[in-house]
Amino acid sequence: MAAEFKHISVLKEELVAGLGVKPEGHYLDVTLGGGGHTELILQQYPDVRVTGVDRDSQAIAAASERLKSFGDRFRAVRSNFGEYQPQGEKFDGIIADLGVSSVQFDQGDRGFSFRFDAPLDMRMDQQQTLTAADIVNTYEEKALANLFYEYGDERLSRQIAKKIVMKRPIQTTKELEEIVFYTYHPKARKVKIHPATRVFQALRIAVNGELDALQYLLVNAPQWLKPQGRLGIISFHSLEDRLVKNAFRQRDIWRILTKKPMVASETEINQNPRARSAKLRFAELKETTE
């Protein structure tokens, strides 16, 4: 399985540079994935250590294999970062690359993408019980509509929810994709972004508790960081970016290092289209709270 997990990290150079890595520092990567960001830190700074956290067992296996040459400078922890608790240690910096990995999108049987006909799953942690099919088939119509609107900014949320309830049970990605697609007017179907994208995003966020995990990180990161430690977060949609921006602004313990988010270059976007929506924000923990 490890060989199959080849995630392409976005804004890799910018994220590592923005950390301001300190000699003999200890860093926390709460979204380890395939290990791309962690690998760059370990390569560029030979006296630092990184602890990597991921809820996906395939990611942990792949990253551990990829980074084994770094020995005890790297440690992997299988955990949802929304539940992670450091064992009394403090870090010089924390990084998070939010959302689903390119590998998870490309593994058709995991149900993250409507490009493949697969069970409606969408679990990052395959040991959890809640799936996208559970939500689609058990939520009341109003709850589904609210979910699609709030987590996906879906303007046809009510119409889509009504059709879903009429056609239940729905078990596969293609079934759901077709319902959403044909809810749209024929002219609105011929757009760059597929009509089902927002509904699939909303379901993925709900299944994996992504916003709750981010809130947990934003609340707890100050306790995990040493003074002048930095927190760098890459987000992929407006809900995430808004949470990060507001958390940095509303708590006086942070010194904001990016007044506007950093974005990918055209070169990177051409090489990795996923980078187009990525936004990177940094803040530094003040030495003392005022």
From Swiss-Prot:
Cytoplasm as UniProt keyword: yes
Catalytic activity: cytidine(1402) in 16S rRNA + S-adenosyl-L-methionine = N(4)-methylcytidine(1402) in 16S rRNA + S-adenosyl-L-homocysteine + H(+)
Cellular component GO terms, alphabetical: cytoplasm
Keyword Coiled coil: no
Localization per Swiss-Prot or TrEMBL: Cytoplasm
Binding site for S-adenosyl-L-methionine: G35, G36, H37, D54, F81, D97, Q104
Keyword vocabulary terms for this entry: Cytoplasm, Methyltransferase, rRNA processing, S-adenosyl-L-methionine, Transferase
UniProt record, GO biological process: rRNA base methylation
Disulfide bond annotation, renumbered to this chain: none
Class of this enzyme: transferase
E.C. no: 2.1.1.199
GO function terms (MF aspect): rRNA (cytosine-N4-)-methyltransferase activity
Its biological purpose: Specifically methylates the N4 position of cytidine in position 1402 (C1402) of 16S rRNA.
Sequence similarity: Belongs to the methyltransferase superfamily. RsmH family.
PANTHER family assigned to the protein according to its UniProt record, in alphabetical order: 12S RRNA N4-METHYLCYTIDINE METHYLTRANSFERASE, S-ADENOSYL-METHYLTRANSFERASE MRAW
NCBIfam families recorded: 16S rRNA (cytosine(1402)-N(4))-methyltransferase RsmH
Record protein name field: Ribosomal RNA small subunit methyltransferase H
Gene that produces this protein: rsmH
